[in-house]
Amino acid sequence: MSEKAIAVKAQKVEEIADQFKAAASAVVVDPRGLTVAQSTELRHQLREEGVVLEVIKNKVLTRAAEKAGYAELNDIFAGPSAVAFSNDDAVAPARILKKFADENEALEIKGGVVDGTIANIDDINKYASLPSREGLLGQLMAEFQFSIRSFAYAVKAVQDKLEEESAAPAAEASTDAE
């Protein structure tokens, strides 16, 4: 192999290692058996959520994973491999790939990395069941809103009770004075 080809591969390993390090999650799949239309549809769904899917040679993946500190992933780099990288939403790749794999048996999820932790197939499936970041923030805001509303109602009830109690002695005092 020429020095130029070796330099190109070394640069590719560096790029993929940097993607692993920067990613909120990276999910590895076996795309064997997907038609061109299915592959295009999958890439489109992933791209809408800011996820990039790359088909990468296993040797490059192995070296990049080791360089990024994820040598445990090397066991899943058998057969064709594609990696879905997401820098923003750690759950998006798992959610989209799981849904797509359920609809298309040809796609097999192998495992990956989520928030710096090695994730097996079961872990990926658990992450896939979580709502998106925006969904979780919405749920959190709804809980805050409910708590604040409940507190406001409690304060209003105490205020009303105090007003009734202070109004009652004043009414008694005015009837006694007559």
Swiss-Prot record:
It holds the Pfam family Ribosomal_L10. One of its GO terms (cellular component) is ribonucleoprotein complex. It comes from the Bacteria. Keywords: Ribonucleoprotein, Ribosomal protein, RNA-binding, rRNA-binding. One of its GO terms (biological process) is translation. GO terms for molecular function: large ribosomal subunit rRNA binding. InterPro entries: Ribosomal_uL10 (IPR001790), Ribosomal_uL10-like_sf (IPR043141), Ribosomal_uL10_bac (IPR022973), Ribosomal_uL10_bac_type (IPR047865). HAMAP family: Ribosomal_uL10. Forms part of the ribosomal stalk, playing a central role in the interaction of the ribosome with GTP-bound translation factors. Part of the ribosomal stalk of the 50S ribosomal subunit. The N-terminus interacts with L11 and the large rRNA to form the base of the stalk. The C-terminus forms an elongated spine to which L12 dimers bind in a sequential fashion forming a multimeric L10(L12)X complex. Belongs to the universal ribosomal protein uL10 family. This is Large ribosomal subunit protein uL10.
